[in-house]
Amino acid sequence: MEPQEERETQVAAWLKKIFGDHPIPQYEVNPRTTEILHHLSERNRVRDRDVYLVIEDLKQKASEYESEAKYLQDLLMESVNFSPANLSSTGSRYLNALVDSAVALETKDTSLASFIPAVNDLTSDLFRTKSKSEEIKIELEKLEKNLTATLVLEKCLQEDVKKAELHLSTERAKVDNRRQNMDFLKAKSEEFRFGIKAAEEQLSARGMDASLSHQSLVALSEKLARLKQQTIPLKKKLESYLDLMPNPSLAQVKIEEAKRELDSIEAELTRRVDMMEL
């Protein structure tokens, strides 16, 4: 028989033994459940064996105690003609209490020499238990404080998480809005670029001078701006010349020439812009 089938058979026999006449609950038979139930059956078997050994040992000790008690009873009867049956009700209660105490303290007999060490050991165990109980109590108080602090921290963290989620949601909305605006601007930029290109192609087909193109006009505008910047120090220099007494007519002529050159450039730029608008 295969090991798996053998385990299933052992498990089935164990379950039948456990439940007896009662129906066995349904369960899925697979290697995993079989392994778990087989492990439980083995542990149950070991436990039953240990319990059986303990019971047998207790039976043997009980038999020994009964024999010893009978021997002591016979000895008392022979020596002092004493029997538990001859005791009063109070004496019987005292005797039973003495026996119960000996059993509870696990002494070998009811002598004072056995009771005193047993009571001392029990007292020591009591003090150790109290000390351990105090340690556990202190530890529990620490755990309660730590738990309270942890709960407060958890609440703060939850609030921080909520705030972070709200901030993240707001920022995400802003990013989405910016992305939409950027896409719109890109689309418009492409639209304008194609529109400018189409207009330039139309103007070129109509015989427009290439110097009137958008790029040329931009370059010309930049050149004009540079020239204006260059004329600023010249104007300042000429203004200083105007303050000089010698030969003011010549300085005035130079100024007029510079003005005419600047007006000519501005007129040319205006003309080209006007032609572009047509």
Curated annotation (Swiss-Prot):
One of its GO terms (cellular component) is cytosol. Transmembrane segments: none annotated. It comes from the Eukaryota. Keywords: Cell cycle, Cell division, Coiled coil, Cytoplasm, Cytoskeleton, Microtubule, Mitosis. Its main location: cytoplasm. Widely expressed. Expressed in pancreas, kidney, skeletal muscle, liver and heart. Weakly expressed in lung, brain and placenta. GO terms for biological process: cell division; centrosome cycle; regulation of microtubule nucleation; spindle assembly. The keyword Hydrolase does not apply. It is found in: Cytoplasm; Cytoplasm, Cytoskeleton, Microtubule organizing center, Centrosome; Cytoplasm, Cytoskeleton, Spindle; Cytoplasm, Cytoskeleton, Spindle pole. Residues 49-79, 124-177, 249-277 form a coiled coil. Component of the HAUS augmin-like complex. The complex interacts with the gamma-tubulin ring complex and this interaction is required for spindle assembly. Associates with microtubules. The interaction with microtubules is strong during mitosis, while it is weak or absent during interphase. It is unclear whether this interaction is direct or indirect. Interacts with EML3 (phosphorylated at 'Thr-881'). Belongs to the HAUS1 family. Contributes to mitotic spindle assembly, maintenance of centrosome integrity and completion of cytokinesis as part of the HAUS augmin-like complex. HAUS1-depleted cells retain functional cell cycle checkpoints, but the depletion decreases the G2/M cell cycle compartment and induces apoptosis. The protein level remains constant through the cell cycle. This is HAUS augmin-like complex subunit 1.
